[in-house]
Design a protein with these regions (language model features):
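Catalytic cores of TIM-barrel enzymes
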Residues: 2-5, 175, 258
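Generic alpha-helical structural signal
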Residues: 28, 60, 64, 89, ...
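C-terminal alpha-helical cap/extension of soluble enzyme domains
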Residues: 8-15, 33, 37-39, 198-201, ...
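Catalytic alpha/beta core domains of metabolic enzymes, predominantly
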Residues: 127-128, 139-246
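Secondary-structure boundary/capping signal
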Residues: 74-75, 133, 162, 184, ...
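Active-site beta->alpha loop and helix N-cap motifs at the rims of alpha/beta catalytic domains
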Residues: 2-11, 15-143, 151-152
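Short secondary-structure transition/capping segments
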Residues: 54-57, 90, 115-118, 146-148, ...
Length: 288
C-alpha cells in the first residue's frame, strides 16, 4: 500500500489580500492558527486559495514564504494544477524548488482530457518532481471526472500519492476505495468527510478548517480511530456552518467568515464578488 504522507484534516487555506496584493503577515497569522490547532498539512493556492487569479510569481512567493514560516511544523502542499501539462509540470518543479513538501494537481479543466490524456498528464507532472503529488478530482469545476477504472493505472505512478476526491458521489468513491484499496483517498467535501473515511479514506482537505480547525481535526481523528459515532456527531454539529460556507461559491463565504472571526483576509479577486447581504447576515447570526 502507498502510505499516506498525512492523515486527518488538511486545510485548504484562503489567500489573504490587502489593497489587492497578497497579505503575507496575515498569511503567517493564519498558518500559526492552523499549527496551534493541530493541523499538520495546509494547501496553499488551491481553489479556496484563489489559484485561478494568482500569478505564477505570486504562487511561488506564497509557497516559499509559507514553508519558510512553518518549517517542519506543518506540511505545505502547493496547488500547481493547470490545463496545460507543460505549465503544470514547470510550476510543479518551481514549487518543489520553493520548498513545497507536496503538490495538489487538479485535473486539466476546460479541454476535457480523455482517460489516456489524464494518465499522460499526471505521469508527466509527477515525473517532473521528486515530491508527492495528489491528484484533485472536482468535476463540478473542471468538466472532467476521473473514471474509477483509471485510478488503478494512476496509482502505479510512483510518486502519485493519492487523490482528493470532490466528485460528490459517495457511490463512486465507495467503488474507488474498493477497487484501489492501496491508493490513498482524501475527501474534498467537508460534508462527506466522515462518510469517505468510513470507506477507507485518509482524511479531508477542508474549507471548514479555515474557520474551525480544532473541531475539523477532532472529527477527522475520531473517524480515523474508528469512532464513527463521535465523528458523525461532531460533523452534525458542524453541518450548519458547512452549509453556510457553501451557500455561495467557494471561497466567497469562507473569506467573509474569516473577517467575522477576526482575521481580515480581504475580499476575493474578480470575477468573484462580495457575499450577498442576505447570506452575510445569516453567517453573522451563526458566528457572532
Amino acid at each position: 500500500m502507498k502510505q499516506p504522507f498525512f492523515r486527518g484534516a488538511c486545510t485548504a487555506l484562503v489567500t489573504p489580500f490587502l489593497g489587492g496584493k497578497v497579505n503575507y503577515p496575515m498569511m503567517e497569522q493564519l498558518l500559526r492558527r492552523q499549527i496551534d490547532a493541530g493541523i499538520e498539512a495546509v494547501v496553499i493556492c488551491g481553489t479556496t486559495g484563489e489559484s485561478a487569479t494568482l500569478s505564477d510569481c505570486e504562487k511561488l512567493e506564497l509557497f516559499r514564504r509559507a514553508k519558510a514560516y512553518v518549517g517542519d511544523s506543518c506540511l505545505i502542499i502547493a496547488g500547481t494544477g493547470s490545463n496545460c501539462t507543460e505549465h503544470a509540470a514547470a510550476l510543479s518543479r518551481a514549487a518543489e524548488g520553493a520548498g513545497a513538501d507536496a503538490l495538489l494537481v487538479v485535473t486539466p479543466y476546460y479541454n476535457k482530457a480523455t482517460p489516456e490524456g489524464l494518465l499522460a498528464h499526471y505521469s508527466a507532472v509527477a515525473g517532473a518532481v521528486h515530491i508527492p503529488v495528489i491528484a484533485y478530482n472536482v468535476p463540478s469545476r473542471t468538466g472532467v471526472d476521473i473514471p474509477v477504472e483509471v485510478y488503478d493505472r494512476l496509482s502505479r505512478i510512483p510518486n502519485l500519492a493519492g487523490v482528493k476526491e470532490a466528485s460528490s458521489s459517495i457511490s463512486k468513491i465507495a467503488k474507488l476505495c474498493a477497487a484501489c484499496p492501496d491508493f490513498p483517498v482524501w475527501s474534498g467535501n467537508d460534508d462527506q468527510a466522515v462518510a469517505v473515511m468510513s470507506l477507507g479514506g485518509q482524511g479531508v482537505i477542508s474549507v471548514l478548517s479555515n474557520v474551525a480547525p480544532v473541531e475539523t481535526q477532532a472529527m477527522a481523528q475520531a473517524a480515523l480511530a474508528g469512532d464513527f459515532d463521535t465523528a458523525a456527531a461532531l460533523q452534525a454539529e458542524l453541518l450548519p456552518l458547512i452549509e453556510l460556507l457553501f451557500c455561495e461559491v467557494n471561497p466567497i463565504p469562507v473569506k467573509a467568515a474569516m473577517q467575522l472571526i477576526g482575521y481580515d483576509c480581504g475580499g476575493c479577486r474578480l470575477p468573484l464578488t462580495p457575499m450577498s447581504n442576505e447570506n452575510l447576515e445569516k453567517l453573522k447570526k451563526y458566528l457572532l
